[in-house]
């Protein structure tokens, strides 16, 4: 390395260091006296101490990477509006065109309405990993932002993802793994998230309701979000259009399911459905296109084929893809019959025999007396 190159590398290194700042805020509301944002964008800012809504709002459009992990948010009243403590304030970063990464405070219990709506920093990411007390993500919290992923894994206190919370973002993946207190996904919570390729719902054992259009148009651009596995949830109801127009291959419905609302899977690309409940759900109007339903592979619990066929109004040729976990299908006159035509039968001399053969036979490698 020549001398000029060495000087250049040193200059770049010093410039980068100069842009990384750590500031302790001893008194909420005093950030303006500690950080000058006039005509500048800070590459990397870490705050500690106590801040309020005014402090955070002051940073809007002035910071690329913001670490708030060790910050406590204090209550503040602005005009007639009260911004509570331990809540990421409503609309605090709305429309920020610079913010690209934020590490959320470990102490917050709630993310307010529109807090990060329309944040469009390059490849916007949010670190939720420290938010062990987070209970609520309010309406439009991240809607229409350039957010890259919704990784809420391990947030065991989270109870509600409100309406439009992650509406029309750039997220590629959704992980709610281990969100054991999550009860509800609100209306259009993940609607129009076109680029999603995976959804993880493992451990969402308290989830009861998926709201109207919650996953509408999921993966419209990516083309395949894989499997939506609700098997570990306690969902009783999927509201109208909640999975409409989704680009997913497989849906696994829980044993607790009671209702599938109007147009739940209308215009979706589902090719496999598995129902874990022995009693079929009540289905709303056009819950799935009739032309699509008869081509979808449907698996139900043992002995439940007839009940599901009746509930879904499937019969004859249209019911050929409906089977139970034992391989039973809907036979003639609505009688369920095991799918045994493929069984190979041999007598003790090794000769292939038919189903009517009497005596000791070997069926698929096992001895059976007929």
Stretches found by the model and what they are:
Residues 2-3, 360-370:
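C-terminal tail/sorting-segment detector
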Residues 5-14:
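Sec-dependent N-terminal signal peptides
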Residues 14-20:
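Sec/Tat signal peptide C-region and signal peptidase I cleavage site
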Residues 20-26, 43-51, 63-86, 97-110, ...:
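Structural signature of tandem-repeat unit edges
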Residues 45, 308, 331-334, 350, ...:
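Terminal processing/anchoring signals of secreted or surface-associated proteins
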Residues 90-92, 112-115, 138-141, 162-165, ...:
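Consensus positions within tandem repeat domains that build extended binding/scaffold surfaces
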Residues 310-331:
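A recurrent domain-boundary module in secreted/ectodomain proteins
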Residues 326-349:
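Residue-level detector of functionally pivotal "anchor" positions at catalytic/ligand-binding pockets or at interdomain
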């Amino acid at each position: 390395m020549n001398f000029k190159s060495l000087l250049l590398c040193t200059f770049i290194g010093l410039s980068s260091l100069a842009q990384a700042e750590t500031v302790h805020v001893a008194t909420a509301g005093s950030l303006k006296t500690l950080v000058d944002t006039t005509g500048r964008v800070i590459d990397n800012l870490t705050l500690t101490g106590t801040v309020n809504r005014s402090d955070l709002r002051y940073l809007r459009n002035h910071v690329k990477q913001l670490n708030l992990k060790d910050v406590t948010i204090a209550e503040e009243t602005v005009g007639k509006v009260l911004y509570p403590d331990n809540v990421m304030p409503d609309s605090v970063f709305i429309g920020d065109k610079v913010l690209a990464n934020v590490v959320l405070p470990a102490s917050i219990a709630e993310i307010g309405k529109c807090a990060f709506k329309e944040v469009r920093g390059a490849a916007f990411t949010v670190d939720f990993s420290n938010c062990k007390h987070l209970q609520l993500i309010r309406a439009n919290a991240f809607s229409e932002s350039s957010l890259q992923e919704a990784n809420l894994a391990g947030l065991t206190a989270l109870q509600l993802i409100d309406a439009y919370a992650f509406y029309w973002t750039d997220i590629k993946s959704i992980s709610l793994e281990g969100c054991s207190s999550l009860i509800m996904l609100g209306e259009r919570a993940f609607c129009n998230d076109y680029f999603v390729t995976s959804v993880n719902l493992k451990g969402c054992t308290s989830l009861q309701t998926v709201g109207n259009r919650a996953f509408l148009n999921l993966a419209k651009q990516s083309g395949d979000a894989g499997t939506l596995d609700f098997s570990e949830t306690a969902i009783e109801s999927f509201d109208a259009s909640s999975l409409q127009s989704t680009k997913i291959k497989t849906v696994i419905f829980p044993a607790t399911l009671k209702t599938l609302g109007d147009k739940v899977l209308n215009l979706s690309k589902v090719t496999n459905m598995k129902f874990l409940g022995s009693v079929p759900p009540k289905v709303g109007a056009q819950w799935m296109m009739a032309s699509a339903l008869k081509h979808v592979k449907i698996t139900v619990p043992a002995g439940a084929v007839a009940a599901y066929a009746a509930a879904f109004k499937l019969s004859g040729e249209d019911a050929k893809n409906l089977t139970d976990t034992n391989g039973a299908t809907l036979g003639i006159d609505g009688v369920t019959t095991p799918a045994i035509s493929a069984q190979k039968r041999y007598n003790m001399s090794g000769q292939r025999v038919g189903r009517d053969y009497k005596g000791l036979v070997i069926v698929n490698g096992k001895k059976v007396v007929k």
